[in-house]
Amino acid sequence: EESIVRLRTGATGALGERLTGDAVAVTRATRRHPDVRQGSSVRGAIDTTLVATRLAQLRDLTGPDDAAYPELVFDAMIVALSGRIHLDEAAETTPERVLREIWEDRFILEPHQAAPG
């Protein structure tokens, strides 16, 4: 999937590589979330990368190590993915809340998990 996203978006450099990896990861996570009946396809990852790239330019984001990077990805996720996921009818949540959970898993929980040891 990452190679498809890179091909379709032209994402390059450190920022492009990181955006592509994160966009593919969060898009895949929409397919595994228990409240989601149908998650997003690779087109969601393409759109997330494109939106995030444009936002990075508008916000003068310097690279993936910029402190504003995680929030930039969340904003891109909301724009690109909120209309692409379909929740289970019994779920008492919103697409935006589901995307926030996925974002927190990727940007808050994963970086702080201890390495296996």
Where do the language-model regions lie?
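C-terminal regulatory/interaction module of P-loop NTP-utilizing enzymes
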Residues: 1-117
